[in-house]
Structure formats: structure tokens, C-alpha cells
Amino acid sequence: MDFNMKKLASDAGIFFTRAVQFTEEKFGQAEKTELDAHFENLLARADSTKNWTERILRQTEVLLQPNPSARVEEFLYEKLDRKVPSRVTNGELLAQYMAEAASELGPSTPYGKTLIKVSEAEKRLGAAERDFIHTASLSFLTPLRNFLEGDWKTISKERRLLQNRRLDLDACKARLKKAKAAEAKATTVPDFQETRPRNYILSASASALWNDEVDKAEQELRVAQTEFDRQAEVTRLLLEGISSTHVNHLRCLHEFVKSQTTYYAQCYRHMLDLQKQLGSSQGAIFPGTFVGTTEPASPPLSSTSPTTTAATMPVVPTGAVLAPPEEAALCLEEVAPPASGTRKARVLYDYEAADSSELALLADELITVYSLPGMDPDWLIGERGNKKGKVPVTYLELLS
């Protein structure tokens, strides 16, 4: 008990000394030991790394989970060391609603069939999103969070300890300075004409006491300097480790980009498949359109919007004499466009023809396009002046 009281009193004294030194430094009444420029640069780089890592981490979490309530729930589960429950993605939820709507409205109707196809695509998109979130969390968010909760806490702890060692060192310097000033004043030879013998004896005794105080202050200063240098070296090594942290975060960033690229490639592939499915059945749903299918036309459901679509083209009259699909690419000059089956299209991007059967395109130019029976729905016949050739639908904006 006595030992604990002595330790408590000693700790309280050290804390008070540091508080006094810190306050005097803030008011400019005490000298402060400055760190070298390289050390200050290391501190600044570490602080910048920590701040930007926090921002990137928070914004990536928002990207992966835009719902703030869901993010708070996941945070609480992690703090409680409990497994985060599986959550249905927005795409999967939309797929569920579309499937239920198709079941209620009639899965055999054109609208119901399309709802089923789109719901299956949305379900695949939701599964791809789930995989992307899982991969990005493991390969990118977890390393960033480990740095903030592990390495940075260690660095912060050692920096606080270095700050305390510096305050102790500066307090020892101030104490030594005061002791030397008092010693110099005490060793001043008194004037025997004005000083009584008794005061002279007291002055000599005080000089001896201040000599002991100076020796004690010098010893404390040496100890404080040694501890400060040791702690500065430990902190310096940790701060220099930030370079390794940057290398690790760079690798994690590459992994994040790779997972994001895979995710968007999967989404593109799923949507392209869906577009082909919808395009192959569009001619059967909307009469007066042709996309390369020979299915019989159904009664019209509604008038089409004047906005452009990539797969809707006027039907070619059956009376037109055209070359077989195998020979269409070789005899394009012999193919006459139908009188009522052409449309205008604006070119979205430059396109370089791969062979003589294709037509090179320039962005923003207007061309005439139409479809031929049996053609790939991703291609149309384009005409510009006397030139004619196949053009990809994705490079065009069909005008009403």
C-alpha cells in the first residue's frame, strides 16, 4: 500500500511537471526542443497517410453500401465480433419483384415473358454485385482498416510517449538553467562592509546546496536525454515503415481495381445477353419491325416511343429480291434498300471498318440504315452517299 501511494505521488508529480512545461511552451515562456526536419517530414507524411486512408475507407464503404443504416448495422456486428447477416442486394430484390409481377400478370404474355427474362438478368447482376462487395471488402477495405486499427494506433502511442519524453527533457533543461543561475548568484562574493558575518555564513551554505542541486539536475538531464533519444529512434523507425504501408496499399488498390473490372465486365456481359434476348423477340412483339427473326408477328401492344432503340428497324418488304445471307457481305452493291424500310441514324463514335464488307464511320455524321432478313441483330446495313456496308448497332443512335 505504501509503495502504491509513493508511485501515485511520483506519477502525479511527473504529470504536474509536464503540464507546467507544456503550458509555459504555449505561452512562450519556456524553450522547446525541436525535432530535425527529416523527422518532421516523417510525421507530416504519416498524418497525411492516416487522414487520406480514413477518407478513402469511408468513401469506399459508401460505394459498396450506399445505405447508411446498413453500414451502421454492419459496424455494430463487427464491434460485437458477430457474423454480418447476408443481405439481399437491390438487383436481387428487383428480380424478385419482377418475377412475382410476371407470375401475377401472366407469364405467357409478352410483358410477362419479358419480365421473367429481365428478372433473371437482374438476379445475375445482384449476384455479381454481392461477389464484388465481398472481394473488395477482403482485398481492399480490410487492409486499410487493419492499418488504422493496428499500425496507426502503435504509431500514435509511441508519438505520445515521445512527446512526454520531450516535455521531461525540456523540464530538466529548465530546472538545470534555474539551478545554475541560483548557484551563480549564491557564489557571488558579498560586500563585507554591508553584510554581517552571519549572512556571509548563510550565503556560503546556500552556495554548497546549489552546487548539489546543479549536479542533481545535470544527472537528471542526462537520463532524460538518453530516454528521449531512445524513444525518438523507436518512433522514427515506425514512421519510416509508412513506406511499406504505401506499398501494401498500392497492391490492395490493384486488387480492388481488378475486382471492380471483373464486376463491370460481368454486368456488361449479362446486359448484352439480355439485350440480345429482348432484341430477338422484339420483332414478334411489335409488328412492322424486323431484327433478323422469322417468328410471326403478334398484335401490337402499344405505340413505340419516338426515342431511339438499337434493335428496332423497319421491316423489309417480302417482295424485295435480296441475296442470301452468306452472299450479302459479298454482294452489298447489288442489294437495293427497301422503299419504306430505311431510317436515319447518327453515328456515336468513330468506327474503322475491319474489311471491305463494313462501312467506316465518323462520329456525329448521319447515315441511312436498314436491316436484311437473316442478319445478325447486332449489325445493320449503312449507306452514306455511294458507299454501303455493314455497321455495328452499338455505334449508332437511330433517329425517329
Swiss-Prot record:
Stretches the record annotates as Membrane-binding amphipathic helix: 1-27
Chief place of localization: cytoplasm
PROSITE patterns associated with the record: BAR, SH3
UniProt xrefs under CDD domains: BAR_Endophilin_B2 (cd07617), SH3_Endophilin_B2 (cd11944)
Residues recorded as bearing Phosphoserine in the entry: 10, 400
Modified residues (N-acetylmethionine): 1
Keyword Cytoplasm: yes
Top-level taxon of origin: Eukaryota
Residue ranges of coiled coil: 205-234
GO cellular component, one term: cytoplasm
UniProtKB keywords: Acetylation, Coiled coil, Cytoplasm, Phosphoprotein, SH3 domain
SMART domains reported in the protein's UniProt record: BAR, SH3
Protein localization: Cytoplasm
Domain BAR: from-to ranges: 24-287
Domain called SH3: residue spans: 340-400
Keyword Transmembrane helix: no
PANTHER family: DREBRIN-LIKE PROTEIN-RELATED, SH3 DOMAIN-CONTAINING
Subunit-level organization: Homodimer, and heterodimer with SH3GLB1.
Family, similarity comment: Belongs to the endophilin family.
The protein's name: Endophilin-B2
Lineage of the species this protein comes from: Eukaryota, Metazoa, Chordata, Craniata, Vertebrata
